[in-house]
């Protein structure tokens, strides 16, 4: 599936046009092209500040956000590489705490693309190379790298010597690339394991644990799993993390949802099982309040979209696009209802399990309004509406999120979900571009 990117900077847009002409088909996973590309650029991946590498089906981005928050609370400067972007391409590359500026971004993309002849790199491989160039040339205390897709054959896995690796929640997604079983997918995620480097994981069903353990053992990586090597407990207002000889109690994260407490604990566990940085307890506690991660159960502020709704309504946004991600969203919606109707405005890419997502959300939603996802192959809104009706939900279609919200005629909790690309449209339309 081709990616899409635009910029208000002519210099950046010229390079994004070159970048968007690249076609990341199903055959591009692998480390050969990214290795060849980085070699032509002087191997910047070998000169990165200490790397924290995070994989997972859901929650890896939030885990990276908590890692960054803890490090910055400790007074450290941090690079972050994540994907996809929501509104601006610059969101993918955070250099020493700040989103990459347009001049640097344009220059780096041009530098990478200019040496790519004969390699045929993908969109993501070029972006990864540009990020690594930026990080290698700019001082910082650490580098946080979110896996793009899978792990074993993801371009970010060219990094051979991270200081710690982690795997967040697992589920079924990207089957065309990673396989159709949760066990196979778990093995792909565990492919980021490196010899002698701690692989910190959540707790998973036994078959997934066994596959991860086997992959890690083959790589020579020790596995430290939740429930065995470290634990976390979420209460009404606090999260308690504990491992051998250490415990810390934080407030529950400001990021909404019980799953975010687990993501916070995973980040703490990763920080506890690496030796490159010293992060004081106060910084671990601060991470719960400091972390920000847009389009993950985010309540939108008053703006052009939010103001369409009747008084007493709330507009929420989440990028959930697979059944595993829909589960905590459904739980959060139930706690927000307070006697109001819950309306789901949704659009999903054509390769997503729309039926599964709607099935998990059905018990928490009263009405569904299906919309298109502009610029991407997506499930037709009429098809989504039919799937919602099959779950005994009232369902209609609309041409846009704004048109959908205009049909809400009573105070409601409205959630836009189903695609990070749709989430980006909503943030832009409501004037909330991530910074």
Label each residue range with its predicted role.
Residues 1-27:
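Charged, amphipathic alpha-helical linker segments immediately N-terminal to NTP-binding catalytic cores
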Residues 11, 25-27, 31-49, 72-160, ...:
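ATP-dependent carboxylate-amine ligase catalytic core
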Residues 48-50, 142-145, 153-166, 170-173, ...:
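Nucleotide phosphate-binding/pyrophosphate-handling subdomain across enzymes
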Residues 52-54:
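Hydrophobic anchor at the beta1->P-loop junction of P-loop NTPases
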Residues 62-66:
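Hydrophobic positions on the alpha1 helix immediately C-terminal to the Walker A/P-loop
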Residues 121, 126, 139-147, 162-251, ...:
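Acidic, Mg2+-coordinating active-site environments of NTP-dependent enzymes
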Residues 202-224, 235-238, 272, 311-317, ...:
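C-terminal helical cap/extension that packs against the catalytic core
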Residues 404-431:
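A glycine-rich beta-strand to alpha-helix segment
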């Amino acid at each position: 599936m081709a990616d899409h990117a635009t910029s208000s900077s002519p210099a950046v847009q010229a390079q994004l046009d070159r970048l968007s002409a690249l076609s990341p088909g199903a055959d591009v996973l692998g480390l050969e092209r990214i290795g060849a590309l980085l070699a032509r650029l002087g191997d910047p991946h070998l000169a990165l500040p200490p790397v924290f590498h995070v994989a997972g089906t859901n929650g890896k981005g939030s885990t990276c956000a908590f890692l960054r928050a803890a490090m910055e609370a400790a007074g450290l400067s941090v690079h972050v590489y994540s994907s996809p972007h929501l509104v601006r391409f610059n969101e993918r590359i955070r250099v020493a705490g700040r989103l990459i500026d347009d001049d640097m971004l344009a220059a780096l993309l041009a530098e990478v693309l200019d040496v790519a002849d004969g390699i045929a790199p993908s969109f993501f491989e070029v972006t990864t190379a540009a990020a690594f160039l930026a990080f290698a040339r700019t001082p910082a205390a650490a580098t946080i790298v979110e896996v793009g897709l899978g792990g074993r054959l993801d371009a970010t896995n060219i990094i051979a010597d991270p200081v710690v690796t982690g795997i967040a929640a697992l589920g079924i997604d990207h089957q065309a690339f990673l396989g159709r079983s949760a066990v196979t997918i778990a093995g792909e995620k565990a492919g980021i394991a490196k010899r002698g480097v701690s692989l910190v994981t959540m707790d998973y069903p036994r078959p997934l644990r066994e596959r991860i353990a086997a992959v890690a053992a083959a790589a020579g990586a020790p596995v430290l799993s939740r429930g065995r090597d470290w634990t976390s407990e979420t209460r009404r207002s606090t999260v308690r993390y504990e491992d051998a000889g250490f415990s810390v109690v934080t407030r529950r994260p400001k990021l909404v949802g019980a799953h975010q407490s687990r993501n916070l604990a995973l980040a703490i566990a990763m920080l506890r099982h690496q030796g490159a940085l010293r992060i004081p307890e106060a910084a671990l506690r601060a991470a719960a309040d400091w972390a920000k991660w847009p389009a993950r159960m985010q309540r939108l502020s008053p703006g052009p979209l939010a103001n369409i709704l009747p008084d007493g309504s709330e507009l929420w946004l989440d990028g959930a696009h697979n059944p595993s991600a829909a589960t905590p969203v459904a739980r959060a919606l139930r706690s927000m209802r307070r006697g109001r109707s819950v309306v789901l405005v949704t659009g999903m890419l054509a390769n997503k399990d729309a039926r599964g997502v709607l099935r998990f959300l059905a018990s928490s939603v009263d009405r569904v309004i299906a919309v298109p996802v502009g610029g991407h192959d997506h499930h037709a809104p009429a098809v989504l509406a039919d799937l919602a009706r099959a779950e005994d939900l009232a369902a209609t279609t609309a041409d846009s999120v704004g048109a959908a919200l205009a049909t809400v005629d009573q105070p409601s909790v409205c959630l836009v979900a189903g695609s990070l690309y749709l989430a980006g449209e909503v943030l832009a339309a409501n004037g909330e571009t991530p910074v």
